[in-house]
Amino acid sequence: MYLANFELKDFRNFEELKINFDPHVNIFIGPNAQGKTNLLEAIYFLALTRSHRTNSDKELIRFGSKFAGLQGKVHKSQLEVELKLRLTPNGKKAWVNRLEQKKLSAYVGQMNAILFSPEDLALVKGAPSIRRRFMDLEFGQINSEYLYFLSQYRQVLQQRNNYLKQLSIKKANDLVFLDVLSDQLAGIAAEIISRRIKYIKKLNSYAQSAHSEISGQAEKLQIFYRPSVKEITPDDDVETIYQKVITSYKKNRPNEIRKGTTLSGPHRDDLDFLINDKNAHDFASQGQQRTISLSVKLAEIQLVHELTQEYPILLLDDVMSELDHRRQSSLLNYIHGKTQTFITTTDLEGISWEIVKEPKVYHISAGTISTKES
């Protein structure tokens, strides 16, 4: 899979851009704050309809403009797909091959993209919300059902939390309605948790292999899904998970009513990263965090390929400077000949040119782009 051409209008600091990409390696070079990351963000947004930097689409529309537009042609092994997005302050619309999609879940997955940025170091030691967002972005683009259930979960969770708040301030007293909301939420939660467990098992296998290679077989990485409902085990089926979530709601009802919020479920779950059986959150050095993050990204590539039969597009946002030569070599060797790769950097020093053969180099300055031979 590769992005052959790309157009954008009024996105961040770019007024207008039309560009053809190399199917293999594309490098964006230039000083900081000129638009390199904005361009990668635009490509990522074309794939997932979400930014990795903000939850507000309004921030993506160039100042003074009424809307932003993105468009690109994706080449897959069996077909070509034209993708188009239009962002306004009131929402976004998506088209696939000029047909407007009624739901974004029908659009996401047409182009798979994996992003690796310095912020990914927070995957290990950052807040649980970072790891949940990682799961949702990754699994949502490889399984449309996951994306659907996630959307449904957020809606019902908001309803349930609102009703719990009403109960907490004595403005409501109908516990039967709370039971209805609890049953709905538990059913959706079970679908999400079941899929997360399944995909984390697969991701763990690929990440272990990559981590072993990068660390020279010196360390063993393990990734575990940690449900907030402690009774859930990796072997539970959807029905069993549902029953355990419902039981948790009943057990925690007085506390949830008192606090006015749902205290367990996918929105409270987490991931554990272990190095040689020790929790990396507590013990990992910065170098080990980099190796874990890199291993997870390489595992994502393999997971997408396993489930879609296509290698995703890889976006490397200013990470080459964060990796030493050994980790750079591991990354570039791993992706060589597999993925179309986009790299941002302030200069060309330090990149392993013996692996990156004949990249296409673009210079970016103040939201404009020009090409030159590497």
From Swiss-Prot:
InterPro entries: DNA-binding_RecF, DNA-binding_RecF_CS, P-loop_NTPase, RecF/RecN/SMC_N, RecF_2. GO terms for molecular function: ATP binding; single-stranded DNA binding. Its main location: cytoplasm. Disulfide bonds: none annotated. It is found in: Cytoplasm. GO terms for cellular component: cytoplasm. Keywords: ATP-binding, Cytoplasm, DNA damage, DNA repair, DNA replication, DNA-binding, Nucleotide-binding, SOS response. GO terms for biological process: DNA replication; DNA synthesis involved in DNA repair; double-strand break repair; SOS response. It holds the Pfam family SMC_N. SUPFAM superfamilies: P-loop containing nucleoside triphosphate hydrolases. ATP binds at G30, P31, N32, A33, Q34, G35, K36, T37. The keyword Transferase does not apply. CDD domains: ABC_RecF (cd03242). Belongs to the RecF family. The RecF protein is involved in DNA metabolism; it is required for DNA replication and normal SOS inducibility. RecF binds preferentially to single-stranded, linear DNA. It also seems to bind ATP. This is DNA replication and repair protein RecF. It comes from Lactobacillus johnsonii (strain CNCM I-12250 / La1 / NCC 533). The lineage of its organism: Bacteria, Bacillati, Bacillota, Bacilli, Lactobacillales.
